[in-house]
């Protein structure tokens, strides 16, 4: 099967999985509200009409942590006897498909272990599952180089090649320790945006819309409020991430401000272009 044929099948499959997951969501929400023992690990498998098995995984450290996150959906497959994974990230117009190569997961384990971040107590044998249990905010970003892709997640940045307008091949991973100042600035702002959306979800029990984001008060962008929220949430992955980000900003404040202003101008220009 070619990559083009594979992506076509995955998109058809994902539509089926999405419909079935949406039908199950009310039951999952009741399970989440009743759950009393934490940390809580939950997983399920969805077998599609094409006989493909998709994984749905979820890990929450505390009750308040559980209120902030939804399960991750992905599928693994083995071209040429090497483990790959596929997952979708919602975009402005349609979902973007990421195909993660075995090389990406090799680099992920190598660099994550090097940083000694093992907040879940021990490494999960299945590295693909471990990645999706740790990373709930997986975001795609506009291309910097023609034919390239970039994504951000709690554990760092991933890079690769653009296969088509809505499909990318993920090849490698950079941990927070390896990021340059411009990369860390983009990462910092993406993760702080993640805190804002998690705060909203924990209070309102649904994902924030663009209209709701535009109406948020200044309180949602206060470092002090973020710190209080993370303290009560008690997710060690986010606690360490937050400390690392604030340390970075303190050590590179002038560069951070310049790059942040540049990103804001670029974002404004893109919004104007869409109007």
What is each PLM-predicted segment?
Residues 1-275:
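Ribonuclease/tRNase effector modules and their secretory precursors
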